């Protein structure tokens, strides 16, 4: 049976879902953050980039933060029709602000549902409780059960984007348009693609990779082999995602 390990630490909370002794989901909750996925907030429109499609909204910053701090801004897509500059819009944050090592990226938001109530996102503990898997609380001063389950290796993989599997490796490369997963290895094309598909599916779920994800597999021999590769990816990703078939060039997109 799958089980959560949960630790409430200083400045961060950690959770790891184990199934059969293997980590299948990792979550890290870091404080503080002005815009977090799931927040429903009233934000002011400061720029209309494409009327009816895209704009930039800003949360009023506290007195000790400059009003131009991009950590308090989000890209709103779609922008509601007839929205004007300086108007207030109720939005839901779908991605926190991130820095990819080159560019600071604003948070992403979408219009909140008509019945949405302003408020902060559910805490990590609340989210994992909603999964109905049992939770084992790990005390910060006791044995580090998360470390024993491979936490440091998971963090290293997330930071480097490099994941090894028998017969090859994955390189996970975030870009402004999508997340790209590149495959390299020494098996024959069909075997490498299938092994990579299983590893990629696990990685997408483990790291919670969302948005548009493109996997570049080696070109496999036939349509049946491509279907096996696509099925292996989706088996690892789990429910809730949609994907294209693997095309003749070995490319698959997951949304």
Predicted regions and their residues:
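DE-rich acidic low-complexity regions and acidic surface loops
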Residues: 1-255
């Amino acid at each position: 049976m799958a089980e959560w390990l949960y630790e409430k630490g200083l400045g961060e909370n950690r959770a790891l879902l184990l199934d059969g002794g293997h980590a299948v989901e990792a979550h890290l909750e870091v404080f503080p953050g002005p815009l977090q996925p799931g927040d429903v907030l009233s934000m002011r429109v400061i720029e209309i980039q494409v009327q009816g499609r895209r704009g930039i909204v800003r949360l009023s910053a506290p007195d000790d933060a400059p009003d131009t701090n991009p950590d308090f801004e989000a890209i709103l897509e779609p922008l509601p029709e007839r929205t004007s500059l300086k108007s207030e819009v109720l939005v839901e944050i779908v991605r926190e602000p991130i820095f990819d090592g080159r560019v600071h990226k604003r948070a992403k938001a979408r219009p909140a549902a008509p019945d949405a109530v302003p408020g902060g996102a559910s805490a990590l503990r609340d989210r994992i409780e909603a999964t109905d898997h049992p939770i084992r609380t790990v005390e910060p001063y006791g044995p580090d059960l998360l470390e024993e389950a491979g936490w440091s290796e998971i963090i290293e993989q997330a930071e480097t984007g490099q994941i090894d599997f028998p017969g090859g490796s994955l390189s996970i490369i975030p870009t402004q348009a999508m997340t790209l997963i590149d495959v390299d290895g020494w098996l024959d094309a069909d075997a490498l693609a299938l092994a990579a598909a299983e590893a990629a599916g696990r990685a997408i779920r483990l790291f919670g990779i969302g948005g548009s994800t493109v996997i570049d597999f080696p070109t496999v021999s036939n349509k049946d082999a491509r279907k096996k590769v696509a099925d292996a990816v989706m088996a690892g990703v789990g429910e809730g995602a949609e994907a294209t078939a693997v095309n003749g060039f070995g490319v698959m997109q997951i949304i």
